[in-house]
């Protein structure tokens, strides 16, 4: 039914860029894409939401797209810092009672934060290829990741200044790259099952998200990555909301071990550990993901 882009204002007067699509009167679905990314139109999601009677809400996290950066907290960025922004978005969109949430890749920890910190409103959550907490007990966090991701997270562990310089060097050149260039760059992080060139629409969407993620420079990508390797600000073992954990055995970006750890440590987990799935191909299961959430909420 088409998308609508708007700006909402936080209590601290920051601006948040919000994108909605699907059925405007449908059940609220919060969609949280990966890192780095910004709110971008994807007709496939719009069509899916319309068909399932859902209203999609997504946003550009601080420093991405047209969303104001967040001042660097003394403790550094944390995943839990996004919850007040999510509450602001829900209030602005008139979502007073309940919603479901799906987080993909770097969006997965935010979906888990919704389940942990907004249990009265978040009725069910799903993660697609989500990272586990960096301090996850018993998990070799970087084992099995592609070399690009290992280098990225290693730089994040060096702190904001070093990581900002890393992102300026390696991320910003991608923000004006062509669809073909983005697909080629992703290929270094992905496995054969994740070949994005088979779907021009998907590659265009990923390219637009990447372009818009860098319109303010590297600050959004820097803070996003720092939050992933810092304490998240909540305990996944305290979650009481149903959470579907989707992860793929062919994922070289977020290895299957992360999904297995979440499935074993989120008390309400409903595991979907797919040996043949990759990081990108889990998007193909999104209809099944949403139908399950609507059943278990």
Regions found by a protein language model. Name each.
Residues 145-234:
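Alpha/beta-hydrolase
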Residues 49-69:
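Conserved alpha/beta-hydrolase
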Residues 81-99:
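Conserved acidic catalytic loop of the alpha/beta-hydrolase fold
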Residues 42, 62-79:
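Glycine-rich "HGGG/HGxG" loop immediately N-terminal to the catalytic nucleophile
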Residues 34-47:
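The serine-hydrolase catalytic nucleophile loop
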Residues 98-141:
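Conserved hydrolase catalytic core segment
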Residues 239, 245-247, 251:
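Short beta-strand/loop motif that positions the catalytic acidic residue
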């Amino acid at each position: 039914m088409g998308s609508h882009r708007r700006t909402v204002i936080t209590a601290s007067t920051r601006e948040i860029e919000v994108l909605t699509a699907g059925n405007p009167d449908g059940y609220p679905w919060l969609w949280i894409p990966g890192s780095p990314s910004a709110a971008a139109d994807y007709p496939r999601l719009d069509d899916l939401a319309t068909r399932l009677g859902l209203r999609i809400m997504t946003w550009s996290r601080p420093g991405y797209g047209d969303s104001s950066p967040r001042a660097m907290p003394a403790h550094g960025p944390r995943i839990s810092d996004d919850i007040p922004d999510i509450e602001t978005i829900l209030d602005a969109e008139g979502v007073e009672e309940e919603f479901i949430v799906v987080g993909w890749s770097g969006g997965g920890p935010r979906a888990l934060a919704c389940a942990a910190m907004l249990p009265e409103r978040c009725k069910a959550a799903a993660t697609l290829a989500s990272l586990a907490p960096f301090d996850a007990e018993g998990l070799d966090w970087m084992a099995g990741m592609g070399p690009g991701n290992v280098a990225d997270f290693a730089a994040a562990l060096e702190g904001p200044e070093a990581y900002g310089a890393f992102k300026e060097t390696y991320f910003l050149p991608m923000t004006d790259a062509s669809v073909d260039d983005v697909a080629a760059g992703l290929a270094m992080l992905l496995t054969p099952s994740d070949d994005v060139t088979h779907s021009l629409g998907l590659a265009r969407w990923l390219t637009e998200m990447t372009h818009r993620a860098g319109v303010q420079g590297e600050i959004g990508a820097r803070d996003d990555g720092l939050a992933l390797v810092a304490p998240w600000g909540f305990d996944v073992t305290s979650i009481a909301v149903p959470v579907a954990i989707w992860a793929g055995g062919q994922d070289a970006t977020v290895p299957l071990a992360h999904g297995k750890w979440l499935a074993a440590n989120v008390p309400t987990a409903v595991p979907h550990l797919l040996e043949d799935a990759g990081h990108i191909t889990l998007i193909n299961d999104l209809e099944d993901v949403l139908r399950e959430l609507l059943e278990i909420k």
